[in-house]
A protein has these predicted regions:
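Short beta-strand segments within Ig-like beta-sandwich modules, predominantly Fibronectin type-III
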Residues: 79-83
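Short, surface-exposed beta-strand/beta-hairpin micro-motifs centered on an aromatic residue
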Residues: 85-92
């Protein structure tokens, strides 16, 4: 009888560990490597390499992680994500669809302008508020998790305005 009880306990323990391992193994390792391409913005005549611009890490960039394919008011917010100094963030996620939204895009328009500063009209041209509202609802990175993966997240900046498509620089060119 003791042998039967011992075998039963061992089988329950092995089965329980197998279930626990299965739940943990459902999470996949996701590494996101973020860089921004910054163009050459004028000045002295550049070499071809300098004229091509350069890539810079998205160091300390802050995003909000949501589950789903597209951003809607019903999108499930999961957590804040902050890139490290190398523009890298490592996550453990279940298989599915996800997207990142810049943290400042979730602010109200007034809060966004206060955080990013007013636009000087003699140097910059702003699009209508509808452009900003659409941009603020657009995911910065969409991805699907199936297995462990590394995702290259690339953005393109414009001279003197960064990655915001609703602002254009109209000031004088660089000397």
């Amino acid at each position: 009888m003791k042998v039967f009880a011992l075998i039963t306990l061992l089988m329950i323990g092995a089965t329980g560990c197998g279930i626990f391992k299965k739940k943990n193994s459902e999470l996949k390792s996701v590494k996101i490597e973020g860089t921004v391409h910054k163009p050459y913005c004028g000045g002295a005549k550049p070499s071809p390499d300098v004229a091509a611009g350069y890539f810079e890490s998205m160091k300390f960039a802050e995003y909000k992680l949501y589950q789903g394919a597209d951003y809607t008011e019903k999108s499930e917010y999961l957590q804040e994500v902050r890139m490290d100094i190398s523009g890298v963030v490592k996550l453990q996620l279940a298989p599915g669809d996800y997207f990142l939204l810049r943290a400042d895009k979730t602010l109200s328009m007034d809060q966004f302008i206060a955080l990013n500063g007013p636009v000087e009209e003699k140097l910059y041209s702003k699009s209508e508020n509808s452009c900003f509202q659409e941009w603020m609802r657009t995911a910065d990175l969409k991805f699907t998790v199936v297995n462990d993966t590394v995702i290259e997240f690339r953005e393109n900046a414009k001279c003197w305005v960064g990655t915001n498509p609703c602002i254009k620089y109209i000031g004088p060119p660089a000397p």
